[in-house]
Amino acid sequence: MTDKNTRTEKIQPFSAPKGVPDYAPPRSAAFVAVRDAFITQAHLAGFEHIELPIFEETGLFARGVGESTDVVSKEMYTFADRGERSVTLRPEGTAGVMRAVIEHSLDRGQLPVKLNYAGPFFRYERPQAGRYRQLQQVGVEAIGVDDPALDAEIIALADRSYRSLGLTGFRLELTSLGDSNCRPAYRQKLQDFLLNLPLDEETRRRAEINPLRVLDDKRAEVREMTADAPLMLDHLDDGCRTHFETVTGLLDDMGVPYEINPRMVRGLDYYTKTTFEFIHDGLGAQSGIGGGGRYDGLMAQLGGQDLSGIGYGLGVDRTILALEAEGVTVGQERRVDVYGVPLGQAAKKAMAGIINDLRAAGISADMSYGDRGLKGAMKGADRSGSLYTLVLGENELDNGTVAVKDMRAHDQQDIALSEVVSALRAKLA
């Protein structure tokens, strides 16, 4: 007898954590298309893949990215593991690549070392459209050569990566942040300017630690106060100026359009000289879809050789949003070439063997499961998007054949079971 007062509590389903997007079909097709297009372009330019850990020692990012950055001071997912070691989910890729290059002595061979990576990165930000706590990125790093031609190659590669997807409504902004020779004098001049402004306590602290960070502040009141701030482009020494002019000249020669933005400051401290960002105005506030720059000095800062480097990170999530804003469709829903419809247990056993043989021959194939009749199973075939459907019942088994239905031409023929794989391979060639 059931107690009237007994209530069965409904089990609540789980949801993804806030700010962590799922890419489920059919949208996952766009995700794969964008990621793979970026990787393909990198491989065409001679970059080799490197697979990095999802988490690293916290000190790697504190030292490499910069303790005064928002990324390190506010946005990192940092925790103590069971051994009481401080580890951090990677917020960006360059520091991890440099750590791996140093650890595995990849910089002791031919230079530049050209590596590409892809995967998720993690930042504790306020979630909104285009800004996620888990962001997907494809990046490249070229390490060991201080050559403006390499800067131009990297920028052109990023530009070509976007255009390979059919994306057109973006623009490239670039500047130079100088180097250790000319930046200190500019830094002092900028700091003197900023400390004479009525800044709030946090912004003043940032101006004292790294005044360039203040120019990266997106608040309207801060941007208004810093409108007349001195600019790095006006304080480059001859070497940095020549480097930057060579980069822009090479981009002109390659037909890569760009705009010079003297106020640009990237969100990471390691950048020097050439710095760039790709902007898409169809995304609202989160308009940056990718960017990068040169980071001479980072390797030495992390305990390696004093070698230069340059790279970029292209945002997969925001690129998908940019494509959607332009009405550009990339990727196709995954379909199988062949779908099997077995009618009865004996047919199911035989069909499983056929499907396995088709897959072994490199033909994508699936089949109907359960005990659905012909009508229900054919609905599954239609939904699969298959080009051919195999129908196998008692009559076909007795005759040693299978009915092969062309789903586009809507015709059907019987083919011997022993020949079905070769016949379908010929039809799909």
UniProtKB/Swiss-Prot annotation:
Protein's UniProt name: Histidine--tRNA ligase
EC number: 6.1.1.21
PANTHER family associated with the record: HISTIDINE--TRNA LIGASE, MITOCHONDRIAL-RELATED, HISTIDYL-TRNA SYNTHETASE
Keywords: Aminoacyl-tRNA synthetase, ATP-binding, Cytoplasm, Ligase, Nucleotide-binding, Protein biosynthesis
Main localisation: cytoplasm
Transmembrane regions: none
Disulfide cysteine pairs (residue numbers): none
Record-level GO cellular component terms: cytoplasm
GO-annotated molecular function: ATP binding; histidine-tRNA ligase activity
Keyword check for Nucleotide-binding: yes
Organism field: Corynebacterium efficiens (strain DSM 44549 / YS-314 / AJ 12310 / JCM 11189 / NBRC 100395)
Family membership: Belongs to the class-II aminoacyl-tRNA synthetase family.
Alphabetical list of InterPro entries matching this protein: aa-tRNA-synth_II (IPR006195), aa-tRNA-synth_II/BPL/LPL (IPR045864), Anticodon-bd (IPR004154), Anticodon-bd_dom_sf (IPR036621), His-tRNA-ligase (IPR015807), HisRS-like_core (IPR041715), HisRS/HisZ (IPR004516), HisRS_anticodon (IPR033656)
Keyword hit for Transcription regulation: no
GO biological process, one term: histidyl-tRNA aminoacylation
Listed Pfam families: HGTP_anticodon (PF03129), tRNA-synt_His (PF13393)
Subunit structure: Homodimer.
Catalytic activity: tRNA(His) + L-histidine + ATP = L-histidyl-tRNA(His) + AMP + diphosphate + H(+)
